[in-house]
Amino acid sequence: MTPEIIAAIKQRIKDFTYIQDVRVFNDQFTKMLADGNPFGYNIASPAALIEFSPSSIEQLGNGVQIYNPIQVTIHIGQMELDGNDALMDEAISIFELRNQVYLAMQEFSTEQMARMYRVSENPDYNHGNWYVYQIVFETSITDHLMQRPKGYTEASPTLTTTGSYQ
C-alpha cells in the first residue's frame, strides 16, 4: 500500500465527516480495552481506522503492479455511555457516523486508486462502551513504485572474449 493512498483516504474522512482521529487499523479498539491498556492506546471519539485486506497483486507491465481487487475496511468507533434517549444500550449515533463515512467514501478515487464501492458492512461487538461499525469497500490500486521510465530498455551486457578455442 502506498503512503499517498493512505493519506488520501485519511484526509477524505476528515474533510467529509466530523471524525478527526483517523489512523491505520492495528486492532486499537480491542487493544485499548485490554486489561490495564498495556499497549497505551488512547483514541479520541469518534475515530476511524483504515484496514487494507490482503490482496493478490498482478503485473501490468513496465514495472507497474495492481492490487485487484483489494478491500478497504473502515472501522468507525464512538464512545457513548448514554444516547440521551433513556435506553442505555441503544446508541444509534454510530449509524449517523456510518452514513457520513459511506457518503464520503462511496465512489472516492485518486490517480492510483479506482472508485471505491461498498460491498458489505456490519457491527463489531465486544468493545465495552465503544460502539464500533465496519464498512467494507472494494477498489483496485496501482503501484508505480517500480515503474520504469518511458522508453526504458534493459542494457545487454557486452561480452568480450579473448583467446582461441581449439
Where do the protein language model's features map onto the residues?
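One-face residue pattern on beta-strands with alternating periodicity enriched for small/polar residues
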Residues: R12, Q71-T73, Q134
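Small/polar-rich, solvent-exposed N-terminal microdomains that initiate assembly or binding
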Residues: M1-V64, G151-Q166
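A short, hydrophobic secondary-structure junction motif
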Residues: E51-P54, I76-E80, L97-F108, Q166
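Short histidine-centered catalytic/ligand-binding loop motif
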Residues: L81-I94
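Active-site-adjacent structural patch at catalytic or cofactor/ligand-binding sites
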Residues: E51-G83
